[in-house]
Amino acid sequence: KNNKFFVAVSGGKDSIVTVELLKEQGIDATAVFTETQKKSTLVDKVIETTDLDSLKIKRYLDRKVLDKNAGYFQGHIPISAIYAFLAILCCVLYKKTYFIMSNEHSSNFGNIKYKGQVINHQWSKSFEFEQIFQNYVKNFITPDVYCFSLLRPFYEIRIAELFCKYKKYLSYFSSCNRNFKIDGQQDKLWCGECPKCAFVFLLLSPFLEKDELINIFGKNLFEDKNFLPLFKDILGFGKLKPFDCVGTFEESKAALYLVRDKFRAGLVLRDFYLKIKITEMLVERFFKPRN
């Protein structure tokens, strides 16, 4: 198709919002998904629902990389940076000008300070990385391709609000990272155990009906005592923000504030609502675009 735009689609709420915003502006784009080691029926279904033309990149890892007994450290892999370089390659090969990502304002904030440095699990999704990457591409690869995030001005909670308008995706999407592990689950969209499940449940809760939310996750996570430690960390009452793609403490508190009546009887509300100390004015701040 003769358009100038590629858009990354991962199967999660953020990339779905990007696709729908582009469609609303009449921008014709081709969906791109990187499939690592195994077929992803989740992403295939989401792309089918978007009704976009698509390009699939198949990525295979050397099994030696996965060997836990190899004698070397297996640290964090900045996968968003790897995808950014793949994006540039795609644009050059297929003669596209723009590759659109879905990295949000919330990814600019770190998890913990260590020896005076802010450690950010999501640094390769941050605006700082995006600027460095754009300059590198322009100076050393090509000035004719531009990779950027459409959702950069938005906090996660604003993206969640936008996503909940697109009901047709509720049965198909997943932001649970266990779906994207090489040995990950295949039989369900949400593991119902991890920080990402807790965070997305919290973010969607102000904007969906109770039954819609429970249909997605299979249970009410606000009433599951096993989730209390996860919500404690996500809301900023634990030792550190989880090393997962979750938003800021403040926007998590804002989401809890917004469901104070809807989920009043839940364990999470009973444990944490009186501790959040947040005002209506501060809540409104998270729905405004940021510079």
Predicted segments, located by residue:
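Nucleotide-activated chemistry modules centered on ATP-dependent adenylation/adenylyltransferase
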Residues: 1-5, 13-291
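Metallo-beta-lactamase
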Residues: 10
